[in-house]
Swiss-Prot record:
Cytoplasmic side: 34-56, 108-184, 240-260
Residue numbers spanned by region Disordered: 127-162
Gene Ontology biological-process entries: cobalt ion transport; response to cobalt ion; response to nickel cation
Protein name per UniProt: Nickel/cobalt efflux system RcnA
Membrane topology, as annotated: Multi-pass membrane protein
Positions in the Periplasmic compartment: 1-12, 78-86, 206-218, 282-283
Length: 283
């Protein structure tokens, strides 16, 4: 530790900044950073690359903020305060929000599918009454063309509602992009609540050595590396969804059921985090 603190006191930032970025990127590859959950979320909402970047950056911002809060809070409250004592509570809070998000995803998908089926039923009923006032030839032509167009339109409408977390009549009731972005930000901020003991330790050492600027720089660099990993995961998920949708005509049908599995996966992650956090609190 003496050699490390000496290097910090010498201010060799040119060496530590790239190293911190690399360590942050490698740290993002370790388990426990919600990468699977974030990818499942992006796939479930058929998110864009912009939304994937937003998700990764939100997770990084909350991750960095938690590091600072714990470091400074620990110094103020008690010298014996450690990151391990706060982690179970943060895990429990994250679990509650994550499980709520999973429930929302499941309910939103079910509601969108139900409203879509109701619209289909209402249209068929109206279409049947409309045919009774026309001759057979016109009825056949109208039914074929109009039904085909409606089936395509309804499927597209349902997919838009599914992707933007709305049931029906999106343009009249909501601005889907804004609502979806807020939901993505909330989910990303939640995913970054679990602190990194390594980053907290580095920051505490720098504070104790009265090298606050260097400590802040290292933590920011560490967070940049972490953001690169998380954003890459999200963008990869978004691109994969877009490419598969273009090359496979049956993707939209599969996408109607995929959110159920995604919400289940996210819910299981939330339950695991909650149990782990509860066990940590009870110790």
């Amino acid at each position: 530790m003496t050699e490390f603190t000496t290097l910090l006191q010498q201010g060799n930032a040119w060496f530590f900044i790239p190293s911190a970025i690399l360590l942050g990127a490698l740290h993002g590859l370790e388990p426990g950073h919600s990468k699977t959950m974030m990818a499942a979320f992006i796939i479930a909402i058929k998110g864009t690359i912009k939304q994937a970047v937003m998700l990764g950056l939100a997770a990084t911002i909350s991750h960095t903020a938690v590091v600072w809060l714990i470091a400074f809070g620990g110094m103020v409250i008690s010298k014996r305060f450690t990151a391990q004592s706060a982690e179970p509570w943060l895990q429990l809070i994250s679990a509650v929000i994550i499980i709520s998000t999973a429930f929302w995803m499941f309910w939103r998908t079910w509601r969108g599918e139900r409203n879509w089926l109701e619209n289909m039923h209402e249209h068929h009923h109206h279409d049947h009454e409309h045919h009774q006032d026309h001759d057979h030839d016109h009825d056949h032509d109208h039914d074929h063309e109009h039904h085909h167009h409606h089936e395509h339109g309804d499927n597209e409408e349902y997919q838009d509602a599914h992707a933007r977390a709305h049931a029906n009549d999106i343009k009249r009731r909501f601005d889907g992009r804004e609502v979806t972005n807020w939901q993505i930000l909330l989910f990303g901020l939640t995913g970054g609540l679990i602190p990194c003991p390594a980053a907290i330790t580095v920051l505490l050492i720098c504070i104790q050595l009265k090298a606050l600027t260097l400590g802040a720089t290292l933590v920011v660099s560490f967070s940049i590396g972490l953001a690169l990993t998380l954003v890459t995961v999200g963008v990869g998920a978004a691109i994969s969804v877009q490419q598969v949708a273009k090359r496979w005509s049956g993707f939209n049908t599969l996408a109607k059921r995929a959110p159920y599995f995604s919400s289940l996966l996210i819910g299981l992650v939330g339950v695991y985090m909650g149990v782990h956090g509860f066990m940590g609190i009870m110790r």
